[in-house]
């Protein structure tokens, strides 16, 4: 099933995370690699960024330090992570612990590609961005489109 949470704070603009310190939230299909019950932001779930696609595109572009340590966490502020508030983070943390992190697929996208076209790619974006958005759209396709809003979708398999 899919469970969606409102994102209260995230930094950056539409487009993928490219390097450490760029303040971007990754876009793509990820898993959860670690649960942190002692986060400064209440509780946190670590996103497995960079994934294989991110690493391949980093090699292709000659980028070495892609960054990492991307979290979904409580509170209402963030730089490069996804803040969903304490209550939602706690609920998600428990769901992830009970489901098992190996059974979670996290889709992070600038829009819901089942209802909206991908954002236009300009000259400042990587040439592989359409390929990324095709992969993200394919990950969303099997699931019914939910209501609109700035939301984080987690797919529990």
Question: What does each model-identified segment do?
Answer:
Residues 1-29:
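Glycine-rich catalytic cores of cysteine/serine-nucleophile enzymes that process amide/ester linkages
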Residues 21-157:
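Exported/periplasmic cell-wall-interacting domains
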